[in-house]
C-alpha cells in the first residue's frame, strides 16, 4: 500500500489503504478469523514501525449515515462526470449498511492504538467534515512537533487502545453555516 515511505517532513495520504482489503475480505467471507487476526497484527506492527521511526500516523474514518450515503451515491451516479465513481460495491455497502458498520467498527477497534489512533469524522456535512480533518491534522502535527525524541521505545508489542465511540454513536447531523465555515477554515489554514 505504500510503495515508498515519504522522506522527513513530507506527507503521504492513503485512501483506504490496508483497511479496504481486510474489511472487504471480512464482508465477503474471504478471510477466516485466523487470517483476519494475522492481518490485524501485521497492520499494527507496520504502523508501530512507522511511529518508532518518527512518523506521524493519523487515521481518519469518514462516517456517514445510510440515508445521506444513498443520497450522495444517487447524486454522483446521476451526473455523467461523476457516475464512474459509483460501483456495485458502493450500492452493496449501502444496502448492507448495518453489517458494514459492524465490520468497520470491529476493524477500527482492533487497529486503534495510542501510537496510530483512529479519528472518526462526522461526514454528514461536507464543510464540517473538512474542518474536522484540518483540526485533526493541525493537532496531530502540533503534538508530534512537541515530541523531542524522533522515536519512541518499543513496548513489547503492547498496543494500548484509545477510547473511541462506536460508529452508530457518532453524531451525524452537525451542520455549519457558510460564514462560520469560512471563519474556521481561515483559522485552521493559518494554524496548519
Can you describe what each PLM-predicted range is?
Residues 1-191:
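Glycine-rich phosphate-binding loop of ATP-dependent small-molecule kinases
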Amino acid at each position: 500500500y505504500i510503495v515508498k515511505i515519504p522522506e522527513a517532513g513530507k506527507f503521504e495520504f492513503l485512501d483506504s489503504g490496508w483497511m479496504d482489503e481486510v474489511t472487504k475480505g471480512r464482508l465477503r467471507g474471504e478471510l477466516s478469523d485466523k487470517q483476519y487476526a494475522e492481518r490485524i497484527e501485521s497492520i499494527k506492527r507496520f504502523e508501530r514501525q512507522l511511529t518508532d521511526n518518527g512518523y506521524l500516523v493519523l487515521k481518519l474514518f469518514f462516517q456517514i449515515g445510510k440515508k445521506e450515503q444513498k443520497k450522495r451515491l444517487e447524486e454522483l451516479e446521476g451526473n455523467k462526470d461523476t457516475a464512474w465513481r459509483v460501483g456495485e460495491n458502493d450500492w452493496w455497502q449501502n444496502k448492507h449498511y448495518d453489517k458494514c458498520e459492524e465490520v468497520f467498527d470491529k476493524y477500527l477497534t482492533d487497529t486503534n492504538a495510542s501510537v496510530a489512533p483512529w479519528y472518526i469524522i462526522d461526514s454528514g456535512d461536507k464543510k464540517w467534515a473538512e474542518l474536522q480533518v484540518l483540526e485533526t491534522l493541525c493537532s496531530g502535527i502540533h503534538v508530534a512537533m512537541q515530541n523531542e525524541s524522533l522515536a519512541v521505545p518499543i513496548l513489547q508489542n503492547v498496543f494500548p487502545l484509545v477510547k473511541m465511540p462506536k460508529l452508530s454513536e457518532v453524531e451525524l447531523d452537525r451542520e455549519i453555516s457558510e460564514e462560520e465555515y469560512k471563519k474556521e477554515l481561515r483559522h485552521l489554514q493559518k494554524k496548519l
